């Protein structure tokens, strides 16, 4: 369970 996708540049919702 991650709070967002800060570590994933390919994530559509790249937010922490």
From Swiss-Prot:
Its main location: secreted. The keyword Cell division does not apply. One of its GO terms (cellular component) is extracellular region. It comes from the Eukaryota. Expressed by the venom duct. It is found in: Secreted. The modification Cysteine amide is found at residue 16. The modification 4-hydroxyproline is found at residue 3. Keywords: Acetylcholine receptor inhibiting toxin, Amidation, Disulfide bond, Hydroxylation, Ion channel impairing toxin, Neurotoxin, Postsynaptic neurotoxin, Pyrrolidone carboxylic acid, Secreted, Toxin. One of its GO terms (molecular function) is toxin activity. The modification Pyrrolidone carboxylic acid is found at residue 1. Disulfide bonds join 5-11, 6-16. The keyword Disulfide bond applies. Transmembrane segments: none annotated. Belongs to the conotoxin A superfamily. The cysteine framework is I (CC-C-C). Alpha4/4 pattern. Alpha-conotoxins act on postsynaptic membranes, they bind to the nicotinic acetylcholine receptors (nAChR) and thus inhibit them. This toxin causes paralysis upon intramuscular injection into goldfish and blocks both fetal (alpha-1/beta-1/delta-gamma subunits) and adult (alpha-1/beta-1/delta-epsilon subunits) subtypes of vertebrate muscle nAChRs in a dose-dependent manner. This is Alpha-conotoxin PIB.
